[in-house]
Amino acid sequence: MTDGVPARGSLRSRGAAAVSAYTLRPITSVIPPERAWGLWLSRQIIARIMGTFGPSLAGTRVEPVDTRLPDGRRVKGEWVYGPRTPTSETERSSTTVGAIYYVHGSGYAVCSPKTHRRLTSWLSSLTGLPVFCVDYRLAPRHRFPTAADDVRAGWDWLVTACGVPPKQIVIAGDSAGGHLSVDLLLQPGIEHPAAQVLFSPLYDLTFALSLARERIRPDPATSAANAVRLVGLYHSGVELTHQRLTLDVAGGPPLPPTLIQAGGAEMLQEDARQLAADIQTAGGRCELQVWPHQVHVFQALPRMTPEAAKAMAYVARFIAHALQDARALAEEAR
């Protein structure tokens, strides 16, 4: 745990979690993600919640990307520029000082760069950096390892086609996007970025950790059983023991400096704790923050919880320091 995290959640955030427990959780528990109408409804509900409680910042500019790498791999996504962040059309190259590569959450099946524009526009505005959010293909139409391969393609495009040095990039992701981000950094041939930021990362795809937490206190938004069904749309037909599903972080190379934030009311807080411990076991530096009484990816819902602004301000400082440290190391190596 780090300084700056309050000992208790605000009255508004605690109230929002309580309301969610009596409204959203009962709804998500009966929607069948395996059915086409159930998945469609889940996507609509999540998009409405994120649009209502976490709208994009006014003045945000978005540039769609749909291109291919020389080897034929397709890259889709969007550049997001928060208010006052230089764009590709300005005289100063927008990626001169660095960029953020964002991998959105989704349970691999329900979200998109559009649903996450509050997070990406906020990250851009607070850091002054452009954010590239990859639009990876979703399950069940596209199963494992499609999303992971799309995330790799997006990274390769950012580094090669856009010419952004890895040490000037910070990778960030939430929920399933956290799992995809870590998977990327464990792949051979990947030069690590300056840092990694994870919001409520999914780490244990068996959801055993979530189930253990659920026995102590239920998540106000969903259940472990429902999450298993949703994520199963992605890895169906593949054993969870696969090395790109059950990630061997503890036995792998040290990951770049990492900040993990999770909510104290969510079941994935146990994933956050385990991932942080495994990063440290492998020799990496990891800062873990569990914010009391906060829901899953609360940073994306500032109209619901005032703690979102405090958490994001901390993230911006972490990113600034990480890029500064990376530049200093590069200067020393010359």
Predicted regions: what they are:
Residues G72-R334:
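Alpha/beta-hydrolase superfamily serine-hydrolase fold, recognizing
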Residues M1-R92, Q324-R334:
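A glycine/proline-hinged amphipathic helix-loop "lid/cap" segment
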